[in-house]
Amino acid sequence: KLLRWYGIDRNSPRKDFRCEENIEEYGYKFHMNDIAAVIGIEQLKYVNDLVSKHINNAKFYDDQLKNLSKITLLPRSDEAISASWLYTIHVDGRDEFMNYMSKNNVMTSKVHERNDIHDCFSEFRSKVPGVDSFCSSQVSIPVGWWLTSDQLNYIVNLIKEF
């Protein structure tokens, strides 16, 4: 069997996109072809507008989600501009939050976990309590260019009600 998509079996059921399954053998992500390259080149015409929408959506969240008791926003540097591909927050009761958002038709994801928790990287397991602490409460919420103002407000209101 060919290993694809970093070694993740995409056919096995899971709650979160890529954070629950043990990866026994690492794989690679080599699926760019000429057609994908042409589509990517064509999309460059729109990249500034799309990234601006991500950034503006993140700023909206920054403003609306600050000072909530169960939510901690990630610090932002004044010296850097994030493209806001993800909008990650820390949530007290993260797993309950993810279930709550799912029941209200909003997808959330942990997106990433420590690599050394998987068998294929077991020889590199280390004690990193700061990373463990970060991973225990972090979750990403939708921030993409495709979100409407109504959808952003819906997400914010759900979070405030949690």
State where each predicted segment sits.
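PLP-dependent aminotransferase class I/II
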Residues: 1-162
